[in-house]
Amino acid sequence: MHKPLIGIGSDVLQNEGERDRAFVFTTYIESLKRAGAVPVLIPPQPENAADLVETLDGILLAGGDDCDPAEYGEEKHPTCETMDPRRQKNDLGLAKLARERGIPTLGICLGVQVMNVAAGGTLIQDIGSAVDTDIDHASEPSDRHRHDVHVDSSTTLGRILGDQEFNVNSSHHQAIGRVADGLRVTAKAPDGIVEGLEDPSHPFYVGVQWHPEDMPGESSASAIFGAFVEAARKYAREKQNAAADLSPVGAAPSE
């Protein structure tokens, strides 16, 4: 059995006078490699997303800039710095396809917000101006400030992590607002900010607001990536078995 192939949604870098670049941070790549997967970049081409996901065993929706609030029917807050429109359309499409087709998906920071918006939910556009809290959620870099999160032990995330409370990094000024229908809150910060979501009807559709890829030596991060890759491995086996069942009688199995 080959290692599972996991696509990472790419960001777009625009510098004046230069050609645009599609990229992902290597911390995502290294985290997936350590967990036993083969990571690949998903280009920001939403018109090809439906065909591309057929080749993947899992999808990682990475962190980045803000989702355009027009997607959930709100005016743009002055602090909102929206991501490249090509990336936004691509990420939202990937989230919808993954949920519809049962493809294992892990959303990180912006990724969990995209999962919520794609399903019809909303975001808090700026925690600092909307929520009375002593927690600095928007510190940069992400490990400059940390806070505790409480995880619901009855959820997929709770079963992955075991501990009901643990400490995470934080680097986000936006957060989950109204939770979309069909999604479930899995973790919260002490101030009530949602720190995790999942679709309980999906084999693995899990998002976290913190950055486990920036916590490589911590057991919680290893557990999250390990569970994600294992779900992708199971999905790959199921695809392989389904393809074998459809093969003509007497046909040689594919390598």
Where do the language-model regions lie?
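Active-site-proximal beta-strand elements of phosphoester/diester hydrolases
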Residues: 206-210
